[in-house]
């Protein structure tokens, strides 16, 4: 779509020192090997796994192609040597800002981030289970942890992040 072309062009212009890589089904296997995943898993959940696998393996920045940048990302990347990850959180879903609901349309992390590794492993456990959509249904204190998260069976990756963040304290900005 033309909006994506505009956003990618802008990212390349604003972040001229960065390599912008556009992924598609024909070039994805040049970067990662996806595990066997049921054909019942929605494309959005496969995309969630892809972004986590790429960030874990290569570090750097994942941005959805429809993000329009107005400035370079140095204000984020300059902090990554001291932090596990940079994430945005959902104002709509977060009821307690001490426990923000992490978004995944923009993720920045150094290579080897424990948080990203653990998030990916948790999410992979969910989507390779026999019933991914109900994987977190029996989660202890589920309503407390999910706060205002709508469509939990669609936003499984968000729940995986919640689970990981509840297990251990990470240095995330």
Residue ranges and their predicted role:
Residues 1-48, 65-173:
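Glycosyltransferase-associated regions of secretory-pathway enzymes
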């Amino acid at each position: 779509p033309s909006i994506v072309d505009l956003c990618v062009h802008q990212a390349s212009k604003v972040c001229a020192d960065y390599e912008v890589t556009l992924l598609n089904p024909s070039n994805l296997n040049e970067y990662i090997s996806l595990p066997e995943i049921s054909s019942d898993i929605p494309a959005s959940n496969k995309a969630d796994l892809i972004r986590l696998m790429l960030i874990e393996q290569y570090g750097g920045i994942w941005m959805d192609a429809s993000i329009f940048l107005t400035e370079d990302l140095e204000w984020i990347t300059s902090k990554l040597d001291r932090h596990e990850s940079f994430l945005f959180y959902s104002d709509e879903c977060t009821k307690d800002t001490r426990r923000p609901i992490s978004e995944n349309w923009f993720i920045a992390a150094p290579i080897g981030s424990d948080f990203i590794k653990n998030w990916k492993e948790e999410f992979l456990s969910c989507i390779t289970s026999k019933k991914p959509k109900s994987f977190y249904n029996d989660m202890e204190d589920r309503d407390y942890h999910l706060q205002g998260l709508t469509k939990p069976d669609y936003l499984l990756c968000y729940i995986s992040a919640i689970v990981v963040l509840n297990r251990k304290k990470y240095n995330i900005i």
